[in-house]
């Protein structure tokens, strides 16, 4: 956070950060994690917009707690270029939070299914509403074609890796696992 955080000591002078992996599956693949388009450092947001015109694929991450709101979609329509990007993937992040918002389901499978249905419908309805308003419809159509979204939970992924390596959870991970235990069928193994 000293290098890329909004209040980092070196944030203002960092142009980019490169990480390399020795993995044959990633040969000739370049993955770029750009700052968000609403980055607090305005120049980085502008660099992101320029860079998107050169990308083949864009992964649009949206926190499931406020998943793909009309404001998010309008923002994407005004900032995503209509040229360059050939494929768009929508990813709902922190999916564990979405599941935990379900106060009625008894089983983890039911909570997962209901959460996915809620977020899929929300994404479709909000995109359709923006299409009706005719905001950058070319980009909207490409976003709609990418439905349904995929959902991820980095905290549960971290838990699974720690469980596999016999490591302890940190406080946040332990709390999520504890809260998910209320669902029948959820197993911490």
What are these regions, as identified by a protein language model?
Residues 1-189:
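Globular "head" domains of long coiled-coil molecular machines
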């Amino acid at each position: 956070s000293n290098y890329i955080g909004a209040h980092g000591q070196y944030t203002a002078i960092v142009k980019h950060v490169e990480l390399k992996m020795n993995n044959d599956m990633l040969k000739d693949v370049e993955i770029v994690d750009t700052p968000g388009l609403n980055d607090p450092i305005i120049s980085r947001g502008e660099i992101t917009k320029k860079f998107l015109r050169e990308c083949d694929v864009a992964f649009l991450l949206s926190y499931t707690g406020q998943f793909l709101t009309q404001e998010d979609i309008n923002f994407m329509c005004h900032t995503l270029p209509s040229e360059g990007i050939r494929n768009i993937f929508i990813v709902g992040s922190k999916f564990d939070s979405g599941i935990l918002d379900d106060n009625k389901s008894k089983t983890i499978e039911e909570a997962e299914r209901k959460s996915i249905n809620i977020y899929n419908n929300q994404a479709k309805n909000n995109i359709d509403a923006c299409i009706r308003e005719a905001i950058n419809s070319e980009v909207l159509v490409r976003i709609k074609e990418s439905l349904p979204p995929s959902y991820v939970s980095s905290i549960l992924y971290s838990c699974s890796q720690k469980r596999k390596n016999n490591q302890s959870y940190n406080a946040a991970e332990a709390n999520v696992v504890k809260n998910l235990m209320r669902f029948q069928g959820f197993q911490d193994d």
